[in-house]
Curated annotation (Swiss-Prot):
GO terms for biological process: pyridoxine biosynthetic process. The record marks 164 as: Transition state stabilizer. Pathway: Cofactor biosynthesis; pyridoxine 5'-phosphate biosynthesis; pyridoxine 5'-phosphate from D-erythrose 4-phosphate: step 5/5. Its EC number is 2.6.99.2. GO terms for molecular function: pyridoxine 5'-phosphate synthase activity. Catalyzes the complicated ring closure reaction between the two acyclic compounds 1-deoxy-D-xylulose-5-phosphate (DXP) and 3-amino-2-oxopropyl phosphate (1-amino-acetone-3-phosphate or AAP) to form pyridoxine 5'-phosphate (PNP) and inorganic phosphate. This is Pyridoxine 5'-phosphate synthase. Gene3D superfamilies: Aldolase class I. It comes from the Bacteria.
Length: 260
């Protein structure tokens, strides 16, 4: 079975807008449903300990929505962030909702957004038991990584299913008009991951402007997770048309990749 690269829409920014007024508008569940109506293959959230955007009730509602609509639910987050008032912790959220995919990300509590991947040599011993636990719940496990990451074979041994390439450096170089060299590095990292049996996802600062070039250069990307750019573009173009524009890019660049 094969299919094109999948689009998972990150709805964090919808929650940011809602929380800015302290009421229920815009409705995160309704926005996610509109993305699914437009053809999105999945929904992504990255709940943080300070509940600056996605909250516990959002995760529960989105889990129910994605299961009812037959699309994937991807929960991102730092598994080492301690539970606290209003935040039960990433593992507790995943245990409760059993998402299709859990993407582990090494972000600090005060970071505005994710900006680096895991160091397998340093953080691997702490990750291994968490990966085992998440896999027991029937969830696919993906690790957020930098281009040129080392230790991919170790990650495969730990039971990791996929990596998510942190594409921020590519987006920056693309904006500057000099992305060829970094694209070659991303392509090499993707191939190395695939050679040891890992699937490859990608995300961070991908947009309508740079997505096609990235997918044209980096082989067999299974999923892209896009939030900030997509929601920003949707302010001008509308949410449903914007999602469809991304799907058009996926169709035109990489119509079929083997699923892992």
């Amino acid at each position: 079975m094969s299919q094109r690269t999948r689009l998972s829409v990150n709805v964090n920014k919808i929650a940011v807008l809602r929380n800015s007024r302290g009421d229920g508008a815009p409705d995160v569940i309704r926005a996610a449903s509109a993305c699914i109506d437009a053809g999105a293959h999945g929904i992504t959230v990255h709940p943080r300990p300070d509940a600056r955007h996605i909250r516990h009730d959002d995760v529960i509602g989105l889990s129910a929505l994605t299961r009812a609509r037959g699309v994937e639910f991807n929960i991102e987050g730092n598994p080492f962030a301690e539970p606290r008032a209003g935040y039960c912790g990433l593992l507790a959220l995943c245990r409760e909702t059993r998402p299709h995919q859990v993407t582990l990300v090494p972000d600090g509590d005060q970071q505005i957004t994710s900006d680096h991947g895991f160091d397998f040599a340093r953080e691997g011993p702490g990750l291994r038991p968490l990966i085992d636990e998440i896999k027991q719940w029937g969830c696919r496990v993906s690790l957020f990584v930098d281009v040129n990451v080392t230790g991919l074979a170790d990650a495969a041994i730990w039971g990791v299913d996929r990596i998510e390439l942190y594409t921020g450096p590519y987006a920056e170089m693309h904006h500057a008009g000099c992305s060829d060299a970094v694209l070659r590095e991303f392509a090499t990292t993707a191939r190395l991951a695939q050679d040891v049996g890992l699937g490859v996802n990608a995300g961070h600062d991908l947009s309508q402007t740079n997505l096609g070039v990235f997918l044209g250069a980096v082989p067999d990307v299974l999923e892209v997770s896009i939030g900030h750019a997509l929601i920003s573009e949707a302010l001008y173009e509308g949410l449903v048309p914007t999602v469809r524009r991304y799907l058009d890019i996926l169709d035109s660049v990489n119509p079929a990749v083997s699923m892992r």
